[in-house]
Amino acid sequence: MKPLFVMLAVLPFLSACNQPESPNAELFPATGAENVNPDTHLVLTFTDSPIVGDSGMIRIYDTMSHQIVDSLDLSIPSGPTESRTYGPECDYTKIPYDYTRTHMPTNRDTRPGTPSGTAEPTPPDYQLNIIGGFTDAFHFHPIIVRDSTATIYLHNNMLDYNHSYYVTIDEGVLTLPDHSFHGISKEHNWSFKTKDSVPASTDTLIVDANGQGDFNTVQGALDFIPDFSQKQTVILIQAGDYEELVYARNKTNVKIKGAGMDRTRVHYANNEVFNPHPLTVKTNEWPGTFPSRRAAFMLDNCSDILLEDLTIATDLHGQAEGLLLNGERIALYSVHIIGSGDALQANGTIYMESCELDGGGDTILGRGSLFAYRSNFRNDGGPFSWVRNTTGNHGDVF
C-alpha cells in the first residue's frame, strides 16, 4: 500500500505544478464576469507601472469556436510622430463628400483604411481602427498606460452580445520593472461573457466606464443610435475619465450630458500629425470637403445635438481640436473644451452658453455661425479666432 500512498500524494503536487502562474494583475472584466458590455476595454492593474513592448500579440477568442475574434499586433506603431510633406496635387475635393450609407461599416465587415470620398486608401503602416463608420480609419494606441494601469483598446465593434470570450497576451507585450509579468495564456482563463442583448430602448442610454451602464464608452452609445433618428436619445455619461477617440456622423436629436465639467472628462491624444488628412485631399475649407480626423471628439454631419456638463479635451499640441463640430443646430451648455491650435472647430450653426474654452493660436476655427453667451475663452498666444465664413454667413458672435 505504501507505493499507492506515495503516488496519490504526488498527484496533487503535479497538478499544482501544471497550473499557470498568476498573471500578477487585477483584471477587468474580471475572470468569469457576466453581463459585460461589448464595447468594453480590457484593463490590467498592476502594483507597479508597466512598460508597453514593441512586439507580441494580444488576441481575443470566441470561447465556443476558439476562433480569433480580434487581435492587436504590437510590432505595428500606433501612428506618425512627424508631420507629412504634401505635394502640389493635394487640394480640396471638387465634389461634395458623400455621407450617405445603408449601414454603418465596422472593423468586422470592412478593411480599415478603405477609402471614402476622393481619398486614396490609408496605408497600413500604423495601427488602424474604423470608428463611427469612417472606413478611412484612425490611428490609435492599442495600449495606454496610466500609472499602474494598462488599458487595452480592441478594434471597435468586434465583440457581440450573448457571446463568451477569452483573452491571451504574449510575453513581452507588457513588462514590469521586476519582470514578474509573463503575459496571459489560455490556461490563465481570462474569460467573460457579454450581455444577452442590446438595450431595450434608445430613449436614454447610460455610459459608465466601470461597466455599470448600457455602454462603457461614449462611442459605443453613439454607434447604437440609428442615423438621422427622428426620436430624441439622451446619453448620460457618468462621472469618470473616458480616454477614447470619439467620431460620430449622421446623428440627429441627441443630448449628451455628463455629470459636470469637473466630473466627466472625455479626452484623447490626437492631432494633425497623429491622424493627418490624406496625402491628396485637404480638409475643412468649405462645406462638403473631406472630414478631418485630428480632433479628440468629432460630430460630423450631425444636427440637433446638445452637449452639456462635461469636459472634452485633446492631450496633444499642434493642430489639435478638442472638439470639432460640423452640422446644424448644435448647442453647448457648461462644456469645457481644451485644445491646442484650432481648439474648437465650429462649422455650421452653433450655440454656446456658460462654456469654457482653452487653446492655442486660432483658438476657434471654422465656417460658423457661432453664437457664444456668458462663456470664457483663453489662448496662449496667436490669433484668437480664424473664421472662414462664406457670403451670407455672419461668422462668430460673442
Describe the residue ranges of each PLM region.
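Sec-dependent N-terminal signal peptides
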Residues: 6-8
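C-terminal motif of bacterial Sec signal peptides marking the signal peptidase cleavage site
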Residues: 13-16
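Acidic, low-complexity Ser/Thr/Gly/Pro-rich repeat segments typical of extracellular/periplasmic
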Residues: 20-199
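Positively charged n-region of N-terminal signal peptides that target proteins for export
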Residues: 1-4
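Sequence-level preference for short, compositionally simple segments enriched
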Residues: 195-212, 216-398
